[in-house]
Every structure is written in C-alpha cells, then in structure tokens.
Amino acid sequence: MSQEKYIMAIDQGTTSSRAIIFNKKGEKVSSSQKEFTQIFPQAGWVEHNANEIWNSVQSVIAGAFIESGVKPNQIEAIGITNQRETTVVWDKKTGLPIYNAIVWQSRQTAPLAEQLKSQGYVEKFHEKTGLIIDAYFSATKVRWILDHVEGAQERAEKGELLFGTIDTWLVWKLTDGAAHVTDYSNAARTMLYNIKELKWDDEILEILNIPKAILPEVRSNSEIYGKTAPFHFYGGEVPISGMAGDQQAALFGQLAFEPGMVKNTYGTGSFIIMNTGEEMQLSENNLLTTIGYGINGKVYYALEGSIFIAGSAIQWLRDGLRMVENSPESEKYARDSHNNDEVYVVPAFTGLGAPYWNQNARGSVFGLTRGTSKEDFIKATLQSIAYQVRDIIDTMQMDTQTAIQVLKVDGGAAMNNFLMQFQADILGIDIARAKNLETTALGAAFLAGLSVGYWKDLDELKLLNETGELFEPSMNESRKEQLYKGWKKAVKATQVFAEIDD
C-alpha cells in the first residue's frame, strides 16, 4: 500500500468507543466501534469502568488498522473527542482508578449540588464558570469520590492522585503517563475552571476542598500534547495533537467558525451550540456559557442548550412502546398521520433541560382523542424534538440579540427527513444537514491535522464538509405560531403536574 498519510480520530462516547481514520479530503477510510458496560449501582447513578474504556479504545485502534490496512506510521496525528464531564480519579504511580468513572448523566451527586445552591453560590459559579450548579458537571463528582473512597482526600493532598475527564485519562494512558493535560473545552465543563481568566479557579477549589495538585494542565484544542508510547500504538510514536469535548468537536467539524453560527447534534440528547466569538456572553435565560475552542492563541466562546431526550425518544417508541421496529420507520408512520397536530408529547423522562432545568418534570402526553392513532402518536414524538430545539434557538436569539439564519445539523436523528422538514417549519429558518454526519470525529481530526500542518488552515477545511441537504421552511406563520403555542401550554402543564403535592 502507498505511504499515504492519514489522521486518526478517537471518539470516546457514553456507550461505545470508536476509532476513525480520515484521509486528506476529510473522508472516512475505516472505523471500528466497541461498546462497554454501563454500571448502575443505584437508581439514577451511572458509572463506567475507566480501565474497560481504555481497553475498548486499544481494541478500536487495532480494528481501524485491520479494516483499512493502514499502518501506524501512516498516521500523521491523533485527535481525541470524548463524552464530557465524566470524571476519573486514579493513582499516579500505578495508573489504577480509585473508583469507577462517574458519568455525566449520573445524579448521585445531586445532594451536593443542592447544598452548594442553598449556600448561595449560584451567582458566583455562574460568573466564573458560565455554568449552572448541577450534578451534570465534574466538580461535585470529584468531591464525591474524594469523600467516599477511604483515604482519598489525604492522598490527593499529598499529590498521589490525579483527576481527569476522559480526554485526560486517554492521553495519560496513550503517552504512558508522560502527559497529564486537558483542553479548554473539557476544562470548561468541570465547573472548576474560570473561563474568563482561563485558569483553575482557586476560590471554587477552596469551596469544594479539591487539592490543585490533582488537576491536569489546560492547553489549547490544537497543539501537540505528547506522543503515543510505541507499545500502546502498535509500534508508532504518533503526536496526539487535537482534543475537544464531543459537542465542541461537532461545532468545529461543522465548520461553524464565525460568531452567530449554530449547530445541533441530534444524538441520544440534543446539544445546540452557538459560536459567540471572542467575547464571553453570560446567558440571562438558563443557557450554559462555555468555551467552543481555542486555536492559534485565540479562545472562542459559545452558548449551549442541552436537551436530555431527543433520539432516545425514538428509541422509546421502538423498545418501550414497540410502536416501530426500527428508528427509520418512525418517518414513514409520521407521514401517514393525518390529524391536525393537536397531540403533544413532552418527553421529560429525566426532567426538562434548557431553558427550563426542571429535574422533577416527567414525560406526559396531551390532546389525545378517540380518533388518535399510532401514526399520530409517533408524529407527535418526533415533533417534540423539534419543539425543544425551538425553545433553545429562541432563547439564544434573546440572549445574543441576533437572528439565527441557518441551523447546521448532524447526528443520527438528523437522517429523519420528516423531523428535519418540521424543524425548518417550526423555526422558520433553513436547516443545513452535513454531508458527512461524522462531524464529532471529523472535528477532532481537523484540530489534530491543523496542529501538524496536515491541513494548512481553516480556509482549507471549509472545502471539506459541505452541506448535504438543505431543508427550507414551508409552513405559514400563523400555523407555525399556533402549533408552538400548544407546545408551550403542554410544557407548562407538565411542570404544574410535577409541582402538585398529594
């Protein structure tokens, strides 16, 4: 095989790890995927075995080489993208985690988050980190591990332990302990990092009693962090030179380099991120302020809205209600529905995310009649995803005083043409679906490739991931607003139901 050079992206997700090899045109040459165990010690708790994650990553690296015939010395650089917020604490000498990784979804630290709120820290944390106080972020997870593993606090203070999000853990393992680093986008999700001053926040560390010695060094999203130890990369010493949390990597992979550009990834949940440029903008309306990416000595901020249930609502139709045999079938049924959209599904199975942040809300359905069919119910479930996206897009426009013209989309549910057309209709703007839906891995590859000169600059990248399809709005204004008003009523009723005591 010719000695063509490639970039490898490692995409470490919530349920599986993947390795993807990309060529110079940004095309996928090969990929390998491996699922790993989800651990649920108690209701609402979600954990992973960090060593099992590492083993799965080693396995998919090998799989990507085997499938493509590409050799380790043909990999110019490695980019890493990861499930964000998930927290690992390990022993510096042995490299062994002292507890399972606590996953972003896990609610086991909710009492600690509530305690911080009741102590009056909400505003302080928001101003420094851009985040709301929530168990979602890493800070309370680190504190929980130090509290619940015997001797951990003392060992952390002695400098015997290290903390990292998954990116940090993987770089540490790949370099055989030579690099203990993270990047701006992952640091910004810990609730320990001051995103204005770009440093770990001493006051927050003191409030939570987390020793600074355990924290990784924070670096930009596109630079060489270290090289793979040859025995961890099949003989190759390859620079690891790009890193970003999954949603920020997707923003970069979608080429959303200009302020005002917005992308939405329709995955298990839905994550909408807007590039707000070099000015940090705190949301007045419950969106998160975070770092999009930092390259070439500049940091670009972002606003983010998280929807907990998106693609997983379609999985619920399939696995929970058995209304469809596979996810793509939901599109066919939705098109067969002939009602007037008076049914509303509010899929608040784990509470409502942005901009409501109501963790007590639960799923509900409104507007059922004797004539409601399976097709109507499926259509209403798909529409609920689009309504939630509108909630966030409207909020972003209020926060930034800008009119969003186009929404760039990717992720599994973005393949559903019915959903994409309804999304365009209910927003009244164009929906641009990426040609290459692997935008998360592609973003990590782009960041890595830029750092080593594999791609020259952002202008060269702009030629690599064009729009695959454009969905334009076709619904009249009064119909659009009437439907959305019904959705707002349904959400309000859902929240009222959650508040009523017996």
From Swiss-Prot:
Gene Ontology BP terms: glycerol catabolic process; glycerol metabolic process; glycerol-3-phosphate metabolic process
Q: What does this protein do?
A: Key enzyme in the regulation of glycerol uptake and metabolism. Catalyzes the phosphorylation of glycerol to yield sn-glycerol 3-phosphate.
At the top of the EC hierarchy, this enzyme's class is: transferase
Q: Name one GO cellular component term.
A: cytosol
Q: List the disulfide bonds.
A: none
Check the record and name the Pfam families matching this protein. Answer: FGGY_C, FGGY_N
What residues does sn-glycerol 3-phosphate bind to? T14, R84, E85, Y136, D246
Q: What is its EC number?
A: 2.7.1.30
Q: Where does ADP bind?
A: T14, R18, T268, G311, G412, N416
Instruction: Name the SUPFAM superfamilies on file.
Output: Actin-like ATPase domain
Which InterPro entries does the record associate with it? ATPase_NBD, Carb_kinase_FGGY, Carb_kinase_FGGY_CS, FGGY_C, FGGY_N, Glycerol_kin
The gene is glpK
Spell out the reaction equation it catalyses.
glycerol + ATP = sn-glycerol 3-phosphate + ADP + H(+)
**Could you list the residue ranges that cross the membrane?**
none
Quaternary structure note:
Homotetramer and homodimer (in equilibrium).
- The PTM Phosphohistidine maps to H232
Signal peptide boundaries: none
- This protein's pathway: Polyol metabolism; glycerol degradation via glycerol kinase pathway; sn-glycerol 3-phosphate from glycerol: step 1/1
Q: What is this protein called?
A: Glycerol kinase
